[in-house]
Amino acid sequence: MLINDNLEQQAQALFKSWFVDFEPFRDQTFKESEFGMIPNGWHAAVLDELCSFISRGLTPKYDENSDELILGQTCVRNNVVTLDNARKHKPKQRTEKWVQQWDTLINSTGVGSLGRVGIAYFDMDNVAIDSHITVVRPKSALVRHYVGRNLLNRQLEIENMAVGSTGQTELPKERVKSLPIMLPDENALIRFNAIIEPIAYQLYRNIEESRRLACLRDVLLPRLMSGELTIADL
């Protein structure tokens, strides 16, 4: 969807302006860090410090009669998580590996897919991830957009964190947890959220509307084609 592509570009441009080029903070005093010069009051952390849960997904037992969905790596693309290629499965039990809104998912196996990052905008309670994906769940609303946008901005770096031989590469969970990340001060995050949240929620609304229309299409199209319904009935 072109509108969503434009919103994604705006969001990433905003992140880069604030946290790569430091445009809103150029009048502040800077200090040396492992990330180069950063504003005073900011500091270095590792990703695990900003998250409540980082884990690979589960091994699914596929079942087309189930209402539970499982996401594979083809569901993470273009910076978002999509349900287009989700499959149905029968879980043994519910776990933290069920996707929550604002989770960030990272493809974690295979050359060409590993390192691809997407944000889960949808708000559903029946979607899990398979073992080829790592879920990154920020621990608070204060950092959730920052963490997601930070990882989206570092997809090539994440790809290069892979281990293993060609064709059998994977991204170890511990490497994700220990990923160095710059942590802005609280005031900067609050100001950033005030701008990024309206964009994020518009993306959420657009994705939900697209999903709703797709479901409606899937229900109506077979009935129209069979003659059970006509255009006049709609």
Language-model segments: what does each one mean?
Residues M1-L58, S178, M182, E186-A232:
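Non-catalytic DNA-recognition/assembly elements of restriction-modification systems
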Residues D27-T29, P60-D67, M161-V163:
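Short coil/turn segments at secondary-structure boundaries
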Residues F30-K31, A45-P60, L69-D103, I129:
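Sequence-specific dsDNA recognition surfaces
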Residues N40, A45, S66, Q100, ...:
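Structured loop/turn residues at beta-strand edges in well-structured enzyme cores
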Residues E64, I70, L105, T109-S113, ...:
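A generic structured-segment signal
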Residues G72, R94-L156, A162-G167, P172-V176:
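A short beta-sheet element
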